[in-house]
Amino acid sequence: MESSAKMESGGAGQQPQPQPQQPFLPPAACFFATAAAAAAAAAAAAAQSAQQQQQQQQQQQQAPQLRPAADGQPSGGGHKSAPKQVKRQRSSSPELMRCKRRLNFSGFGYSLPQQQPAAVARRNERERNRVKLVNLGFATLREHVPNGAANKKMSKVETLRSAVEYIRALQQLLDEHDAVSAAFQAGVLSPTISPNYSNDLNSMAGSPVSSYSSDEGSYDPLSPEEQELLDFTNWF
């Protein structure tokens, strides 16, 4: 009895010690589900960032081709008028003008007009003045040759040929007149044979010459005024 009581008292005096709790581990299914969700979220974020980058690149490529609308509102014909305004803006920039000077447009079938140097411009101006003076000279010469004033369409070659023939006729007439005057002054020719020469002058000039036939005792040469009155159109 005493031993049993001692055992009970000894058992009552000793209290049971608590055992340490093991850490809680999630199941394998929950772990894999969490990893899959994290991977899906990362993939979605990467896809969204890639899409945003692609949209930004497209906007940057389309920005030079689109016309900015006035006050932030696009007009009805924005797509048609956008290239025109962009072209105007580009052509007004000095950088583009310098690039156009360096480009070669011969392959497209046209070329940009180039400014002439000052020396070339002066040479062209002198050539134009020379041609103008030549034309004025021919117009003046055409007025002095026979039938030149009536025929205004006479070419330059015809005008020169007519002037040469006219000068030769005048020179021949002057030579004949000087020879006859010298012969009469020297006494080689007598007044009796002078009517033949007067008839020749009458046939050429178409006007009578009385100084050789009216008076047989004296001879009066032609004066310069009478010489100018001779008509030389019969030579042509």
From Swiss-Prot:
It comes from Homo sapiens (Human). It is linked to Genetic variations in ASCL1 may play a role in disorders of the neurocristopathy spectrum manifesting with features of Hirschsprung disease, congenital central hypoventilation syndrome, dysautonomia, in addition to neurodevelopmental issues. Residues 118-170 form the bHLH domain. Residues 42-70 have a biased composition (Low complexity). This is Achaete-scute homolog 1. PROSITE patterns: BHLH. Gene3D superfamilies: Helix-loop-helix DNA-binding domain. Residues 1-26, 42-98 are annotated as: Disordered. Keywords: Acetylation, Activator, Developmental protein, Differentiation, Disease variant, DNA-binding, Neurogenesis, Nucleus, Transcription, Transcription regulation. Residues 81-90 have a biased composition (Basic residues). Signal peptide: none annotated. GO terms for molecular function: bHLH transcription factor binding; chromatin binding; DNA-binding transcription factor activity; DNA-binding transcription factor activity, RNA polymerase II-specific; DNA-binding transcription repressor activity, RNA polymerase II-specific; E-box binding; identical protein binding; nucleic acid binding. The modification N6-acetyllysine is found at K156.
